[in-house]
Amino acid sequence: MSFLNRLFGKSDASQHNQGGTTMLNIGIVLGSTREGRVSPQVGEWVKELADKRGDANYEVIDIADYNLPLLGEAGQDASGAATWSEKIAQMDGFIFIVQEYNHSISASLKNALDYLRVEWNDKAAGIVSYGSVGGARATEHLRGVLSELSIAHVRVHPALSLFTDFENGTHFAPKDVQAQSVNDMIDQLLPWTEAMRSVRTKAGEVANN
């Protein structure tokens, strides 16, 4: 068992179904909508690794599938907002697939985050990033945004390099070590997600009293 597993506790299907509790729903959010993006390749790879664990329900959520114009811009069709709200509300936690744009996250991801508030609150998230320096600077920016939205973000952070984990910058071919990094991140994410679900449940009980 790795140091991280000893420290945070390795999550498995039996641990997350004790007492008949419902399995956690984890949304893998693709953070880019641009033409020619590689985030779908990264997202499907993360989902494939996660599904092998059998410890939660994992679903890829593509921002591009929702009609989300710039928030507050007059005369725009924001018909996708209600569907976006419903989908995010269904999730217990998230894995954000993040690419770096000028030291930050994409405008589409920031916009999608800004559309909602309570749907994000008291949930947990992990981050998988990529870029010339592994998307590290975008990740640090995203952490500040997630904190403001009351999303607890785990420390372990798989960082993919455009130089070593991609071929010609377009074909995703991760090094073997990256799979372990993703699993270590999920090992942290699931206990945090379970804990935050308890927070939401307790808050609901208080509100109903």
Language-model segments: residues:
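Short, well-ordered alpha-helical segments in soluble proteins
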Residues: 116, 120, 146-150, 193, ...
